[in-house]
């Protein structure tokens, strides 16, 4: 059985039907046992314990001092609170603290106990900080990474959709943060969270795989090719087009592998294997710095080399390569 990709959590209950139940949402926001997932300018709150791995700092409402009853409607309307779903029968909300220059003080400097992290996690020294989820590179538990990714993605969407794309009037958050509506009575356009589809593919030629290098990559890193799906294009056509545009390689058979949400800022990565029907590479220097064929056995023996790197462990790119190497 194939494990889900990182940033996915099948066990997480989104409870979508609850989003329109205003009284239920309000009751959960008055429940001290409900949980908030703080986000500050697209960074997530994490707790680091000396000698252990970082943990997501999901805090109970009680731990952050609660939310005043007369502030709930305003915070929901502005999209500063977003209902994420239910975990272990407790409602979880993304909490935007981006307006604060001192976010940890805004959260009343959460302690080890408040964050629910046991001292047995590996050390007596703790650090609470806001961090870029990408830099944690899959070190969080899978379920925690998925929760933080969802909170980050939803609040990013709200921050970019304060105004109506149809008429320019301000928008207001509804359905517990899962829709924004234009406030102009003549418009009232509804806006929903968007996810931009992108294909990501490992192109193979027998025992060889095609990997490319973007000039922004860290030294020595090569990865799979990828690109956005264009309007009116099938996923398979997008795979073939992107590979041709970036490397001049033609592909034939295309096989779906899996997908991965990638909230950096708002993508869904659709993973494929593609079989090459040509082998001569011509790199589009506007897209890539380099592209080359790598033998499977060579990759197996150089995965941990200091001079050569594969993509991060939390990425579907690494999953595509890893599964191919395991064959």
Regions from the PLM with identified roles:
Residues 86-89, 205-207, 278:
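Short acidic-glycine loop/turn motifs at beta-strand connectors
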Residues 260-267:
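Acidic pyrophosphate-coordinating catalytic loop
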Residues 1-79, 83-161, 172, 218-222, ...:
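Nudix hydrolase/Nudix homology domain
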Residues 180-223, 250:
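N-terminal strand-loop-strand
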């Amino acid at each position: 059985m194939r494990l889900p990709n990182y940033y996915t959590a099948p066990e997480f209950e989104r409870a979508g039907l609850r989003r329109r139940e205003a009284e239920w949402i309000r009751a959960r926001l008055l429940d001290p046992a409900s949980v908030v997932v703080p986000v500050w300018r697209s960074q997530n709150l994490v707790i680091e314990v000396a000698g252990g791995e970082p943990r997501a700092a999901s805090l109970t409402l009680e731990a952050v001092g609660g939310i005043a009853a007369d502030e709930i409607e305003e915070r929901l309307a502005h999209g500063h609170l977003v209902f994420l779903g239910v975990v272990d029968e407790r409602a979880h909300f993304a909490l935007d603290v981006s307006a604060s220059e001192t976010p940890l003080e805004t959260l009343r400097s959460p302690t080890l106990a408040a964050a629910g992290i046991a001292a047995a996690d590996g050390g007596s020294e703790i650090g609470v900080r806001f961090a870029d989820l990408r830099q944690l590179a899959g070190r969080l538990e899978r379920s925690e990474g998925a929760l933080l990714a969802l909170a980050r993605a939803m609040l990013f969407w709200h921050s970019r959709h304060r105004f109506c794309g149809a008429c320019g009037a301000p928008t207001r958050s509804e359905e517990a943060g899962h829709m924004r509506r234009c406030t102009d009575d003549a418009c009232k356009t509804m806006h929903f969270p968007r996810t931009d589809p992108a294909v990501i593919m490992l192109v193979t030629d027998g025992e060889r795989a095609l990997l490319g290098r973007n000039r922004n990559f860290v030294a020595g890193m090569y990865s799979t090719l990828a690109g956005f799906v264009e309007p009116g294009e099938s996923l398979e056509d997008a795979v073939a087009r992107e590979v041709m545009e970036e490397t001049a390689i033609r592909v034939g058979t295309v096989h779906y592998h899996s997908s991965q949400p990638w909230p950096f800022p708002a993508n869904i990565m659709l993973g494929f294997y593609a079989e090459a029907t040509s082998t001569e590479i011509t790199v589009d220097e506007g897209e890539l710095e380099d592209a080359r064929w790598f033998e499977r056995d060579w990759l197996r023996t150089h995965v941990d080399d200091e001079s050569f790197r594969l993509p991060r462990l939390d990425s579907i790119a690494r999953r595509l390569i890893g599964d191919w190497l395991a064959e």
